[in-house]
């Protein structure tokens, strides 16, 4: 029986893409993933994940990757959950080897609803199980999670080579916030790697626009 797992990396950052990976393997090869030490990707360092990447790919029958750009995230018509459903389905439908059972790390507080939303849009018949923290429960989801994180880390390194070191890209990172403020101060806008609909970006934009408005009003009074 073919078993698939799907997970994402990069839902929360204000900078960079969202990466979704679907991975499929013959059920009796899951023990090979266990032997590799595949587990919840959050428990592994970036170096450990990078080291596991090629080993995981060798075990898998197939995997697919969907990269969702900041522009697509900002331009979404519905919620982030709906965007994830759409792109999880895209990744699962892209698999050349179709699974009979699919395990997914649920982005929805109602895991069963998340599973049904995906199952109903698949181009093939499969049982879909969505659970919270599935990446810590099922090796095939852990494998998908590791691949997604490594692919996103590689994308982030490319962006840093072009735009400079913006830290982790998460709103809670002071380096990221400092980089965003400095970039906006210098250019009067954000580059395409930034999710402009995120509160962090919106607040910085509003702050600079208020400052500019105050300056404009001051200069207007001075000229009068």
From Swiss-Prot:
GO terms for molecular function: manganese ion binding; RNA binding; RNA-DNA hybrid ribonuclease activity. Disulfide bonds: none annotated. It is an enzyme of class 3 (hydrolase). Keywords: Cytoplasm, Endonuclease, Hydrolase, Manganese, Metal-binding, Nuclease. One of its GO terms (cellular component) is ribonuclease H2 complex. Residues 1-210 form the RNase H type-2 domain. Gene3D superfamilies: Ribonuclease H-like superfamily/Ribonuclease H (3.30.420.10), Ribonuclease hii. Domain 2 (1.10.10.460). Its EC number is 3.1.26.4. It catalyses: Endonucleolytic cleavage to 5'-phosphomonoester. It is found in: Cytoplasm. InterPro entries: RNase_H2_suA, RNase_HII/HIII, RNase_HII/HIII_dom, RNase_HII_arc, RNase_HII_hlx-loop-hlx_cap_dom, RNaseH-like_sf, RNaseH_sf. A divalent metal cation binds at residues 7-8, 105. Manganese or magnesium. Binds 1 divalent metal ion per monomer in the absence of substrate. May bind a second metal ion after substrate binding. Its cofactor is Mn(2+); Mg(2+). Pfam families: RNase_HII. CDD domains: RNase_HII_archaea_like. GO terms for biological process: DNA replication, removal of RNA primer; mismatch repair. Belongs to the RNase HII family. Endonuclease that specifically degrades the RNA of RNA-DNA hybrids. This is Ribonuclease HII.
């Amino acid at each position: 029986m073919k078993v698939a797992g799907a997970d994402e990396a990069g839902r929360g950052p204000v900078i960079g893409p969202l990466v979704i990976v679907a991975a499929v393997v013959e059920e009796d090869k899951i023990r090979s993933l266990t032997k590799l030490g595949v587990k919840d990707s959050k428990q592994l360092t970036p170096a450990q994940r990078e080291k596991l990447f090629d080993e995981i790919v060798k075990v898998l029958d197939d995997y697919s990757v969907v990269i969702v750009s900041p522009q697509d995230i900002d331009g979404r018509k519905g919620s982030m959950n709906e965007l994830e459903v759409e792109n999880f389905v895209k990744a699962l439908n892209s698999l050349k080897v179709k699974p009979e059972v699919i395990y997914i790390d649920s982005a929805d507080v109602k895991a069963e609803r998340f599973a049904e939303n995906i199952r109903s849009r698949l181009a093939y018949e499969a049982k879909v199980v969505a659970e919270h923290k599935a990446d810590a429960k099922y090796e095939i989801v852990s494998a998908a999670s590791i691949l997604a994180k490594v692919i996103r880390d590689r994308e982030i390194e490319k962006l840093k080579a072009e735009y400079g070191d913006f830290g982790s890209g998460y709103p809670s990172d002071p380096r990221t916030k400092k980089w965003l403020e400095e970039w906006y101060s210098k250019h009067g806008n954000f580059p395409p790697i930034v999710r402009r609909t995120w509160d962090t970006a919106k607040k910085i934009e509003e702050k600079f626009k208020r400052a500019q408005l105050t300056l404009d009003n001051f200069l207007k009074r001075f000229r009068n």
